[in-house]
Amino acid sequence: MRIVEDEREEKLAKSVVLRSYWNQNDMLNLQEYLDKWSDIDLEDIRKRMQKSEFIEILSPNLKMVWNPEKLESNFTQEGDILWLKTPQSWVHWIMPDGFKLEQTHPSLLQLAVDLLLRPWHEEVKAPLDEGREKGVNYALSYSAGNDSSAAMQLMPEDTILGYHERNFNSNLNHDNAHRMINHLRKNREVLTVESNHEHLRRLRGKPTGFSTDYAASVHLVLLADFLDLRGIAFGTPIDNTWLAKGLNFRDFSKSKHLQFWRDRFAEAGLELIHPINMISEAGAMKICKESSFIDFMNSCMRGNGVKGCGKCWKCFHKNGPLGRQYDVKSREIYSFLKKRPLRSGMHAIWATKVMNIKHLLPDYESILDSDLGWWEQYYPPGLELIPSELREHVENKLKQYLKPMNTPYVMETINLYLE
C-alpha cells in the first residue's frame, strides 16, 4: 500500500485508511495495519476492537471446497495472508514478508491441518508426504509467559521465538505478552504471527482455544521451510509431562502421547522438543526470577500490559509466588481451590505453601507439611528426552539455575487422586 511521501500528511493519510477499514468492517486489514502503523494513535478503535464480542470469520477472494483427499490443496495465499479452507470455515495467518506457499513442503501443510482438525476429522490422520529434510534452526513456540520464557533460557540463544497471536476479540488480552516481547526485541528478534485458528473449537460449542496440545505451534510448522527449521520446542513443564495434569506420576518417556507426536512431527522432518519437561512451574519461576526480564514477564492473559488482573488462576499460581497481587476470594480462584481433583495439582499445593495460605487446602495437610523443596529442582531422567544435539547445552544451562532432585525421587510417588 502506498502512503503519501509528505511526512506532515502521512499520519493523516494512515488514519483515514484505518478508519475506512473500521467503517467497512474489514477487521483483517484493520488489524494488520494497526500493527504495522503502531505510530498512529487510534486508541478508540483499538479499544473497541478488544471489547467487541463479535467474531467475523473472514474468507479470501476465492471459492474453494474442502478436499479431504489432498489436504495441502486446501491452502491458498493472497499477499501476506495464508488461508486454509476447512470443512466449516476459513482459517488465516498473516505471514512474514517473503513467505511463499509454493515453497512449503506438503508434509508441513498436512501436519498443520492435522494439528488443527484431528479431534473432528479422521482424514487428517493419514500418513504425511515423505521427503522433507531437517533444517538447521530451532524454534520455540513462545507465549511470553513463565514456562516458555524458562524454555527460552535453556535453549540456544539463536533459537527463533515464534509468538502466535489470536487476532479476533475474546477475553484474552495480549498487552502483557506485548510488553515482554517488546522488551526482548531490544536484544533479539521475536516473530509474531496473527491467526484466527482458535475459533475452530468455538464452532463446535467449545471454549475458544487450541484444538490439540501442539496447535499453538501451527504458525511455526507452516514456516518451517521459510525458517529452515530442524525442530520446534515447547515450554511444557513437569506438570504436564511426568505428572498427568499435575496430579499423578507417569513414565512420560514411554507414554503413547510422546511417542505418537514425536513420530508425527518426524514425518514432516521436525524434531519435537521439550526443553523443560524435567522442571516444574516452580522451577521455571526460579529460572525466570534470575533473568533480566522478570519485571516484564507476566503470565496473566487478562492484564493491562503492566500487571495481572489479580483474579484469574494464572495470577494465583504463577504470579502469586512471585509476590504479585491476587485475590483469593475471586470467583475463579476460589472455585478452583475447592475443585477436586485440584486444578494444577502439585504446583497449586506448592504455591499455597510458599504463599503461607496452606489453610485453604486442609485436605492436603500431609503433603503441605512435608518438604517440597524437590518441586523447585529438576528431574534428571527428563534430560534423556532432549535430542542429543541439544542435550549438553540444555543440561549445562539448567545446572546454572537448579539442583537435581535426590533419589529416590519423591515425585515418582505422587498420586493426588489418593489424597
Q: In which residue ranges do the predicted regions lie?
A:
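N-terminal cap/recognition module
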Residues: V91-L117
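Nucleotide-activated chemistry modules centered on ATP-dependent adenylation/adenylyltransferase
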Residues: L12-D26, E32, W37, R46-E72, ...
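Metallo-beta-lactamase
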Residues: S143
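ATP-binding N-lobe of GHMP and related small-molecule kinases
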Residues: N74-D80, I94-P96
